[in-house]
A protein has these predicted regions:
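Basic amphipathic alpha-helical segments that dock to polyanions
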Residues: 54-61
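N-terminal helix-turn-helix DNA-binding core of bacterial DNA-binding proteins
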Residues: 10-53
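Basic, amphipathic "hinge/linker" alpha-helix immediately C-terminal to the N-terminal HTH DNA-binding motif
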Residues: 74-96
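Amphipathic alpha-helical dimerization/coiled-coil segments
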Residues: 2-3, 90-122
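Glycine-centered, phosphate/nucleic-acid-interacting loop/turn motifs that mediate DNA/RNA or nucleotide
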Residues: 65
Length: 122
C-alpha cells in the first residue's frame, strides 16, 4: 500500500483515493512520480506512496470516470498525466467533506465529555 511510520495501515486505509482526488483538484494535472513527491513533501515524509498502490488507485479512479489521462513524450519516454473530470472534481469535494464530517464524529467519541466518567460505575 503506502508506508507511514507514524500511522497504522488500517488507519490510512481508504484515504488514498481522497488524497489523489484532492491533489489533482488543486494542481490540475500531474503524473505519477509528481504525485508521490507532492504527498511526501506535504506530509513531511510521513506518507510515502508506493507505485504498487498508486497506479492501481489511479486506474480505479479513471475506470470510475473521475480521471482522464493524456500521454506526453519526454524525450523518447511517454509520461501519463492524470486530470480530474467534472465528475472527479465533484467527487473530490464530496469525499473531503465526508472525511471532515467523519473526523468530527470521531472527536465526539474520543474526546472526554464534561460530566461523563468512563470506566466507573454510576
Amino acid at each position: 500500500m503506502y508506508i507511514c511510520p507514524m500511522y497504522s495501515k488500517e488507519l490510512l486505509k481508504g484515504t488514498l483515493s481522497t488524497i489523489l482526488l484532492t491533489l489533482l483538484d488543486e494542481k490540475g494535472r500531474m503524473y505519477g512520480y509528481e504525485i508521490t513527491q507532492a504527498v511526501k513533501e506535504r506530509t513531511d515524509g510521513k506518507i510515502l506512496l508506493k507505485e504498487g498502490s498508486l497506479y492501481p488507485a489511479l486506474h480505479k479512479l479513471e475506470a470510475e470516470g473521475f480521471l482522464s489521462t493524456e500521454e506526453e513524450f519526454i524525450g523518447k519516454r511517454p509520461r501519463i498525466y492524470y486530470r480530474l473530470t467534472a465528475t472527479g472534481k465533484a467527487q473530490s469535494r464530496i469525499r473531503v467533506d465526508e472525511l471532515f464530517q467523519f473526523f468530527e464524529t470521531l472527536q465526539q467519541v474520543l474526546l472526554p465529555q464534561p460530566g461523563l466518567h468512563y470506566g466507573t460505575a454510576g
